[in-house]
Amino acid sequence: MTTVTLTSSDGVDITVDRDVAERSILIKNMLEDLGESDEAIPIPNVNEVVLKKVIEWCTHHKNDPPSTGDDDDSRRKTTDIDEWDQKFMQVDQEMLFEIILAANYLDIKALLDVGCKTVANMIKGKSPEEIRKTFNIQNDFTPEEEDQIRRENEWAEE
């Protein structure tokens, strides 16, 4: 099994199986560009803790078939998450958002989907006030602006 070394943004080298690292389209393309080089691949936007978490997910999913364009629509229409991924995503909000940012940067579409579905499930069925509380968001609307928005979006409440 061939391994590659990834260097996190905080300068930590992590050795990982090549097939695991190649779950990331970004890393796969970099490896193709580098050829047979043993050079470490810098991952400047992802720190060690988050990179290890992403590698854990990639290791679990290393044998998953690559996603095709065909399943994009059906995948997007559901917020169902398999049991292992649900447990994996049981992290604090900061880590959840860091995983989403890392998945986006590293171009790991399936992990990005799981992260976004996790956030969608956190929002589902909640009022704006509950969502603000969940994500610690300040309400910057005046009562008049809120009323106007409610009137403009009455159709969505039906």
UniProtKB/Swiss-Prot annotation:
Any single GO BP term: negative regulation of cytoplasmic translation
Pathway the protein acts in: Protein modification; protein ubiquitination
Stated role: Essential component of the SCF (SKP1-CUL1-F-box protein) E3 ubiquitin ligase complexes, which mediate the ubiquitination and subsequent proteasomal degradation of target proteins. Controls sulfur metabolite repression, probably by mediating the inactivation or degradation of the metR transcription factor.
Protein family (similarity comment): Belongs to the SKP1 family.
Highest taxon, organism lineage: Eukaryota
Organism from which the protein derives: Aspergillus fumigatus (strain ATCC MYA-4609 / CBS 101355 / FGSC A1100 / Af293) (Neosartorya fumigata)
SUPFAM superfamilies linked: POZ domain (SSF54695), Skp1 dimerisation domain-like (SSF81382)
A single GO molecular function term of this UniProt record: cullin family protein binding
Keyword annotations from UniProtKB, A to Z: Ubl conjugation pathway
InterPro entries named in the record: SKP1 (IPR016897), SKP1-like (IPR001232), SKP1-like_dim_sf (IPR036296), SKP1/BTB/POZ_sf (IPR011333), Skp1_comp_dimer (IPR016072), Skp1_comp_POZ (IPR016073)
Gene: sconC
Region of interest called Interaction with the F-box domain of F-box proteins, as start-end residue ranges on this chain: 100-158
The protein's name in its UniProt record: E3 ubiquitin ligase complex SCF subunit sconC
GO cellular component: CBF3 complex; cytoplasm; kinetochore; nuclear SCF ubiquitin ligase complex; nucleus; RAVE complex; single-stranded DNA-dependent ATP-dependent DNA helicase complex
Assembly and interaction partners: Component of the SCF (SKP1-CUL1-F-box protein) E3 ubiquitin ligase complexes.
